[in-house]
């Protein structure tokens, strides 16, 4: 069997939730959209079932999957519905929809609901993707408040630059949010992972923990308070020694500078490892760091082995405990979210 493995350490997931909940205070949503950022939404949700105040997803299908698996917690649809007919499933599965544009609002208010719905009303406080502008927010809130079909309203917005503390954008967005919601009763939600960790003023009634929940610092590098949940590993299935000035891989982008031990490992861009990862991207053989050499292929990669490192059959960590996924993402010119969400053709093992 091809030895590409993903370990999901559910104990680390629980640890991270506790840390983030303690920091935020109040209530905390575990964001499990995109199959829990590639970790497996159902397994992660059940691992957090006795801790989490609720879960957040992006689509109706993601919410239904959690409900049909037995999750009874609040489930927030962060993007709301994509067509009016989806409100039927919102009611059937007791989901909490976000409302972030005029047609979502009108469709919700024009529907005859059998039971009142809890609405997350989104403000565009400066990210300019979705949400009502601050100067329109109070009137939209009033329209929802007057409806017999609306149970309660959570006021929320999303930060564009919370992972860039020096930008000043988070403070600008908080000011816009506070002005736009002034005098409007009800719960609030502002803090994403970066704000939970770094912006105390953004910690309102509900937090939304995404990247940090999976043990990854939104600021790059590592955060000793968090434990990585995903570990991607494979094994060396070929080994050879190349003479100096030997090219390796497609495009002959790397030439050895000396006699070099080369290990061939079972992972490539078809598995989700980024093809853009250059030579010198880190990997670890039995816990000892080394590097990728040559271009990443569809199904395999080549790595450098020094004289002291084990070869054929030995484990190679691509990211996890020794290799920080932020380092791999930075080398490849991408972000850790993309790396985790793209993993496929791997065996997943869940460790309690």
From Swiss-Prot:
> Which Pfam families does this chain map to?
Ala_racemase_C, Ala_racemase_N
If you read the UniProt record, what top EC class would you report for this enzyme, in one word? isomerase
Q: Which CDD domains match?
A: PLPDE_III_AR_proteobact
This molecule's function is given as: Catalyzes the interconversion of L-alanine and D-alanine. May also act on other amino acids.
What name is this protein filed under?
Answer: Alanine racemase
In the UniProt entry, which residues are flagged as the active site?
Answer: 33 (proton acceptor), 250 (proton acceptor)
EC code: 5.1.1.1
Q: Which family does it belong to?
A: Belongs to the alanine racemase family.
Give cofactor(s), names only. Answer: pyridoxal 5'-phosphate
Q: Which residues, by range, are in coiled-coil regions? A: none
One annotated GO molecular function is: alanine racemase activity
Pathway this chain belongs to:
Amino-acid biosynthesis; D-alanine biosynthesis; D-alanine from L-alanine: step 1/1
Q: Which domain of life is it from?
A: Bacteria
Q: Which InterPro entries match?
A: Ala_racemase (IPR000821), Ala_racemase/Decarboxylase_C (IPR009006), Ala_racemase_C (IPR011079), Ala_racemase_N (IPR001608), Ala_racemase_pyridoxalP-BS (IPR020622), PLP-binding_barrel (IPR029066)
Q: Which residues carry this modification: N6-(pyridoxal phosphate)lysine?
A: 33
Alphabetized, the UniProt keywords read: Isomerase, Pyridoxal phosphate
Query: What residues form the membrane-spanning segments?
Result: none
For the biological process aspect of GO, one term held by this record is: D-alanine biosynthetic process
Q: Name one GO cellular component term.
A: cytosol
Residues given in the record as substrate binding sites: 129, 298
What is the reaction catalyzed?
A: L-alanine = D-alanine
